[in-house]
Amino acid sequence: MGLAGPRKRTKISHDPNNTAWSRSTSGYGHKIMSAQGWTPGSFLGASNAAHADHFTAGSAGHIRVILKDDNLGLGAKLRAEDEPTGLDAFQGLLGRLNGKSDEELEKELKKRHDRQLANFVEKRWKTMQFVSGGLLVHEKIQALADVKSAGGEEVQTPQISHDELKSEKRPKKARKKEKRRARGDDTGLDLAEQSPKRKRKDRKENKEKKKSSDDSSYANQGTPSEDALVDKIQKKRKKRKQKDPEPSNTEVHDDSLPPDTRSVSQEEQESRYSAKNESIRKIREHRPMGRQFTRGRHIQQKKLALMDSKSISEIFMVKC
């Protein structure tokens, strides 16, 4: 028994580089891809596609896998082990020996500095890298050419007056309104523009105008029977207006009445007003139905029991 650790017997496989699957032509993937027009060494996708110019030699190659040789997590990179230090100064020295100017050396140094900063940010905070999936539409930018005639004379553009430009800018509705006004059809306005209140007012006014025109036509006629009918209609309207006056919240005070009678009349009015309000409240009471009704009764009983001291003592079994 020595101090040596346990021996690990490793067996080298027949395919250490793992390239047998890419060379085999008997697999299902190779067969179906070759049936669809793929050949070994060519990249995937149509060769006449709009984004075919962006393909490189790497597009035809396989996906490379780096073997993990450290205890870091997946996707981690060795930071400072493989990076040489002092290489920037050495490259600058070689550039001066080759006869490069100071401006060129400063530009190269700035590029390297920016690249180092980008690498540091990517390692520290992880940036997103976008891969282009191809061009959707193959656009061609055409240069604008001056429109000239065959003889070299410039084509004269028709001059448009200021009024015509204004008329073009105006909306169609405004033009239609102006045309109607010119014709004299002011009554034919768009009903869609009018609000519903305006529509109701217009209807009422039209009805009143019709009634007044009918009354005037009846009055203009000379027969005594028709005049009597018109008088009756007008009297009926006056009576209706007197019977149904508008409700007013303001109190009416009669200066002619004495103070005693005035106070009595005010008390009678207030009593009538309160009675009316009570009747309205009774009518407007919400009466729940079904489950809500039973729940409401139980809640009322609980409230009454809590308000009564005897019932509380009975609930908690306390002797008074």
Swiss-Prot record:
<protein>
    <recommendedName>
        <fullName>Protein PXR1</fullName>
    </recommendedName>
</protein>
<feature type="region of interest" description="Disordered">
    <location>
        <begin position="1"/>
        <end position="24"/>
    </location>
</feature>
<dbReference type="GO" id="GO:0003676">
    <property type="term" value="F:nucleic acid binding"/>
</dbReference>
<dbReference type="InterPro" id="IPR050656">
    <property type="entry name" value="PINX1"/>
</dbReference>
<feature type="compositionally biased region" description="Basic and acidic residues">
    <location>
        <begin position="243"/>
        <end position="256"/>
    </location>
</feature>
<comment type="similarity">
    <text>Belongs to the PINX1 family.</text>
</comment>
<feature type="domain" description="G-patch">
    <location>
        <begin position="25"/>
        <end position="79"/>
    </location>
</feature>
<dbReference type="GO" id="GO:0006364">
    <property type="term" value="P:rRNA processing"/>
</dbReference>
<feature type="compositionally biased region" description="Polar residues">
    <location>
        <begin position="15"/>
        <end position="24"/>
    </location>
</feature>
<dbReference type="Pfam" id="PF01585">
    <property type="entry name" value="G-patch"/>
</dbReference>
<keyword id="KW-0698">rRNA processing</keyword>
<feature type="compositionally biased region" description="Basic residues">
    <location>
        <begin position="169"/>
        <end position="182"/>
    </location>
</feature>
<dbReference type="InterPro" id="IPR000467">
    <property type="entry name" value="G_patch_dom"/>
</dbReference>
<feature type="compositionally biased region" description="Basic and acidic residues">
    <location>
        <begin position="203"/>
        <end position="214"/>
    </location>
</feature>
<comment type="function">
    <text>Involved in rRNA-processing at A0, A1 and A2 sites and negatively regulates telomerase.</text>
</comment>
<feature type="compositionally biased region" description="Basic and acidic residues">
    <location>
        <begin position="269"/>
        <end position="288"/>
    </location>
</feature>
<keyword id="KW-0539">Nucleus</keyword>
<feature type="region of interest" description="Disordered">
    <location>
        <begin position="152"/>
        <end position="298"/>
    </location>
</feature>
<dbReference type="GO" id="GO:0005730">
    <property type="term" value="C:nucleolus"/>
</dbReference>
<keyword id="KW-0690">Ribosome biogenesis</keyword>
<feature type="compositionally biased region" description="Basic residues">
    <location>
        <begin position="1"/>
        <end position="11"/>
    </location>
</feature>
